[in-house]
Regions:
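Generic structural motif
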Residues: 6-11, 27, 42-44, 64, ...
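Acidic, serine/threonine- and proline-rich intrinsically disordered appendage/tail regions
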Residues: 110-157
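Extended, solvent-exposed segments with strong compositional bias
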Residues: 53-94, 106-113
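Intrinsically disordered, low-complexity polar regions and short flexible loop motifs
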Residues: 101-103
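Noncatalytic linker/hinge segments flanking ATPase motor cores
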Residues: 46-48, 62-67, 80-82, 140-149
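Extracellular Ig-like/FN3 beta-sandwich strand-entry sites
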Residues: 95-99
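Short, surface-exposed linear segments at secondary-structure transitions and domain or protein termini
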Residues: 43-46, 60-72, 121-135
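Canonical alpha-helical transmembrane segment with a positive-inside/aromatic-interface signature
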Residues: 1-51
């Protein structure tokens, strides 16, 4: 599997809403089944005694599991009032050493085994006010093609 290099805060849903999103592509020759994603945000803070601590927050996903994963999936955390990204500015979260941990689990039917992938995005890899460029095109025969080298390309808004 290949992950986008960055995770973006992008327009999402209604005009005033935003989502935290990254892309993942299946680089295998086989279709993966029952693919699930989990995101956890972790930040540092100083407690009342001056001791450094870590906070962990599970990030809700628009879709946490897809039954069939043939090519590309944009995983989206809708930023609602419960999200750490709504409660703190991106600058604040970067100061608190935010890291978004990503865990993917899937089933490779061809080999009959579980497939796991993981990555993380640190503060400097979180891009605010941006959106991903299109990675799929229709070829001359009208078939949908995916350029996996462009899954992480984005534009600032």
């Amino acid at each position: 599997m290949k992950f986008s290099e960055n995770i973006l805060i992008s327009p999402y849903g209604k005009s005033t809403e935003k989502g935290l999103m990254f892309r993942i592509t299946n680089r295998r020759d086989t279709t993966l089944l029952e693919t699930s994603a989990q995101l956890i945000a972790t930040t540092s803070y100083q407690d009342k005694n001056g001791k450094m601590k870590r906070d962990f927050a599970r990030l809700n996903l628009e879709i946490s599991e897809i039954k069939m994963f043939p090519s590309l999936w944009t995983v989206v955390h809708p930023i609602d009032e419960e999200s750490i990204f709504a409660k703190h500015s991106l600058e604040e979260l970067i100061k608190r050493n935010i890291e978004v941990l990503v865990m993917i689990k899937s089933h490779d039917e061809s080999y009959g085994r579980a497939v796991y992938a993981r990555t993380s995005y640190k503060g400097d890899e979180i891009i605010g006010n941006a959106k991903f460029k299109t990675s799929s095109l229709l070829n001359a025969e009208g078939e949908l093609t995916l350029d996996i080298d462009t899954i992480g390309k984005f534009v600032k808004l």
